[in-house]
Amino acid sequence: MPKMKTKSGAAKRFKKTAGGLKHKHAFKSHILTKMTTKRKRQLRGTSMLNKSDVARVERSLRLR
């Protein structure tokens, strides 16, 4: 049987770390003029994936 392929879209969006799965924030690509500076600042950087979504993303990344 051939190897299972990783979902390439998931591979681009999530990174496996020792603490869990890391991801970037959504809603930060365009039409940012309506958004407050505080909100744009809060959406910077990365955060850890919610526990309820981990199983689904791990299946997409073929970690499970």
From Swiss-Prot:
Which PANTHER family would you find in this protein's record? 54S RIBOSOMAL PROTEIN BL35M (PTHR33343), LARGE RIBOSOMAL SUBUNIT PROTEIN BL35M (PTHR33343:SF1)
HAMAP family named in the record: Ribosomal_bL35
Question: Which keywords fit this entry according to its UniProt record?
Answer: Ribonucleoprotein, Ribosomal protein
**Its family?**
Belongs to the bacterial ribosomal protein bL35 family.
A Pfam family it matches: Ribosomal_L35p
Return one GO MF term.
Answer: structural constituent of ribosome
Q: Which GO terms describe its cellular component?
A: cytosolic large ribosomal subunit
Which taxonomic lineage is given here? Answer: Bacteria, Pseudomonadati, Pseudomonadota, Gammaproteobacteria, Pseudomonadales
| Chain intervals with Basic residues compositional bias | 1-28
The answer, when asked if Iron is one of the entry's keywords, is no
Keyword Ribosomal protein set for record: yes
Name the source organism: Pseudomonas aeruginosa (strain ATCC 15692 / DSM 22644 / CIP 104116 / JCM 14847 / LMG 12228 / 1C / PRS 101 / PAO1)
Compositionally biased, Basic and acidic residues: which spans?
53-64
Q: Where is this region: Disordered?
A: 1-64
Instruction: Please give the name of this protein.
Output: Large ribosomal subunit protein bL35
- Mention one GO biological process in which this protein takes part, according to its record: translation
InterPro entries from the xrefs? Answer: Ribosomal_bL35, Ribosomal_bL35-like, Ribosomal_bL35_CS, Ribosomal_bL35_sf
